[in-house]
From Swiss-Prot:
Protein's cellular compartments: Cell inner membrane
CDD domains recorded: F1-ATPase_gamma (cd12151)
Annotated protein name in UniProt: ATP synthase gamma chain
Keywords, alphabetical: ATP synthesis, Cell inner membrane, Cell membrane, CF(1), Hydrogen ion transport, Ion transport, Membrane, Transport
Length: 287
């Protein structure tokens, strides 16, 4: 059995660790509400953009934007993978990466090649170690991400799709369901899935200048950027929720370990006292 001093040292070490996990839990709890607010605030913009594109697509029946045209054969697939910059978020990132590798292998088994751009330090570090062709990366996105920091990697995929180098693009991220549940999601980004036809609730039509096709050309890129940005906000909220839950579990485990070590310490102390008493009694009897 370890000595009382060694056990006390272990207890002190676990208590210090518990202070860190509790602090991280409280920080994540305070950040998650702000992240949820940003996520909810951005949703109406993406929904409005989707409606506008639906109107524009119907107004320009003689023109189909390249982002709306399905390719007959998929020879190369692109993925935009979003992760966190920091760890200590349970299995949030690893679960996403494992599913991403499975999806990439499935396409490779079909004979398609895979290209990847990553958003977030964890994804960048992980996929540089595996046999996946990374064509772009951005890190240090922070808790309040800016759209400007994403435009570069988004453009890499948009240009590749426009030039015919990539036939399909997926957006991979952790969708925020609630504080306890975050779901790894694979959304098809390009070509855009067919939008539902807009039902007219009025007797007038829209007038586009110079024409619907030109407006659609400008709006489409903004819409793609808004989808990636929305996914990033979902992932940030998921990160804080996962970290809060993971740190709470770590704090609870620390409490259990401290209780166990305290019990061991009490038994060791009791055994030492019993030994001392036995020695005193034995010495007195000898006299």
């Amino acid at each position: 059995m370890a000595s009382g001093r060694e056990i006390k040292t272990k207890i002190k070490s676990v208590q210090n660790t518990r202070k860190v996990t509790r602090a991280l839990e409280m920080v994540s709890a305070s950040k998650i509400r702000k992240a949820q607010d940003r996520m909810k605030t951005s949703r109406p913009y993406a929904q409005a953009m989707k409606q506008v594109i639906g109107h524009l697509a119907q107004a320009s029946t003689d023109y189909q934007h390249p982002f709306l045209v399905e390719r007959e054969q998929v020879k190369r697939v692109g993925f935009i993978v979003i992760s966190s910059d920091r760890g200590l978020a349970g299995g949030l990132n690893n679960n996403l990466f494992r599913k991403m590798l499975g999806e990439a292998k499935a396409w490779q088994d079909k004979g398609a090649e895979v290209d990847l751009v990553t958003i977030g330090q964890k994804a960048s570090t992980f996929f540089r170690r595996v046999k996946v062709n990374m064509v772009g990366s951005v890190t240090h996105i922070g808790d309040v991400p800016k759209l400007e920091s994403l435009i570069g990697v988004i453009k890499v995929m948009l240009d590749a799709f426009t030039e015919g180098k990539i036939d399909r693009v997926y957006l991979v991220y952790n969708r925020f369901v609630n504080t306890m549940v975050q779901k790894a999601s694979f959304d098809q980004l390009l070509p855009l899935p067919p939008a539902e036809k807009q039902v007219a609730h009025h007797d007038w039509d829209y007038l586009y200048e110079p024409d619907a096709a030109t407006v659609l050309e400008h709006v489409m890129t903004r819409y793609i950027e808004s989808l990636v940005y929305q996914a990033l906000l979902e992932n940030v909220a998921s990160e804080h929720a996962a970290r809060m839950v993971a740190m709470k579990a770590a704090s609870d485990n620390a409490n259990k370990l401290i209780g166990t070590l305290q019990l061991v310490y009490n038994k060791a102390r009791q055994a030492a006292i019993t030994q001392e008493i036995s020695e005193i009694v034995g010495g007195a009897a000898a006299v």
